[in-house]
Amino acid sequence: MKKKIAEYEVGEQVDVFLLIKTATKGIASNGKPFLTVILQDPSGDIEAKLWDVSPEVEKQYVAETIVKVAGDILNYKGRIQLRVKQIRVANENEVTDISDFVEKAPVKKEDMVEKITQYIFEMRNPNIQRLTRHLLNKHQNEFLDYPAATKNHHEFVSGLAYHVVSMLDLAKAISNLYPSLDKDLLYAGVILHDLGKVIELSGPISTTYTLEGNLLGHISIMVNEIGKAADELQIDAEEVLILQHIVLSHHGKAEWGSPKPPLVKEAEILHYIDNLDAKMNMMDRALGRTKPGEYTERVFALDNRSFYKPSFHN
């Protein structure tokens, strides 16, 4: 079986089929155009440069295009890149299914649905339970397919649901340690905090931002969705406002994207849980591609740090 892109080491030759995740045009110091492409398979992705591209070539190598690439792996300023020697668009008789090239959550969709449903079932506040169930049912298909982000953390098929399931387990453990927390509010906040991303993002493959995503963002989208759900369910209670606040404040600070800081206890805890799970996912994925006794490539979203994998961690 051929190696996946994440399994190649610096200096090794590559001759594989990959999917273009993104393609961004730039201008080199010599004034000539180039493309920065992110190429992916189920193991992860890698950056590559296509130099001196013509308008015709630029039109060929766009997102969601499967390509045959030959080249070698190099380390450029702490980041692993693929130096392209040959590239062409794959023929239809060679590969056909884009889904074969995308990374997916390590848990089955049906298992995640079952787990989230159980958390909703455990809720004792009828207003919170009805709102949460209504909104999840409304967006369930997209929720189970979409990534949690375009980059940095859980940026794979079903990443959004996987992020939520992990956060729910964290929320349960913390609630058991601190029984003064309102489990219903915390669980609902976990389930709903990023649900607006099914409107903010374009889909599970070659994910970009929609018009609503660029102009509104997932936080304000979800605050509005909660308000609409409350109207549809004829719920006129403070729980609606508190849930909206939890979603609104989950990034923690204005400079991180939240118009208000957390002002209820469950909102503060949700912010920490969200941050913890995102950072753990980034570190685990970077370390998963690293040999014991070596450093990861730089993780931009974690202050551009390289993390060391202890030599006794086999």
UniProtKB/Swiss-Prot annotation:
What organism does the UniProt record list as the source? Bacillus anthracis
Q: Say yes or no: keyword Transcription regulation present.
A: no
* PROSITE patterns registered for this protein in UniProt: HD
Pfam families on file: HD, tRNA_anti-codon
Show where the HD domain sits: 163-279
| Main function | Shows a 3'-5' exoribonuclease activity.
Its name, as the record gives it, is 3'-5' exoribonuclease YhaM
Q: Where are the transmembrane segments?
A: none
State the HAMAP family in the record. Answer: 3_5_Exoribonuc_YhaM
Q: Which domain of life is it from?
A: Bacteria
> Which residue spans does the record list as DNA-binding?
14-90
Q: Which family does it belong to?
A: Belongs to the YhaM family.
The record's Gene Ontology biological-process terms are:
rRNA 3'-end processing
EC identifiers of the protein: 3.1.-.-
| Gene that this polypeptide is encoded by | yhaM
Q: Could you state a single Gene Ontology molecular function term?
A: 3'-5'-RNA exonuclease activity
Question: Keyword annotations for this protein?
Answer: DNA-binding, Exonuclease, Hydrolase, Nuclease
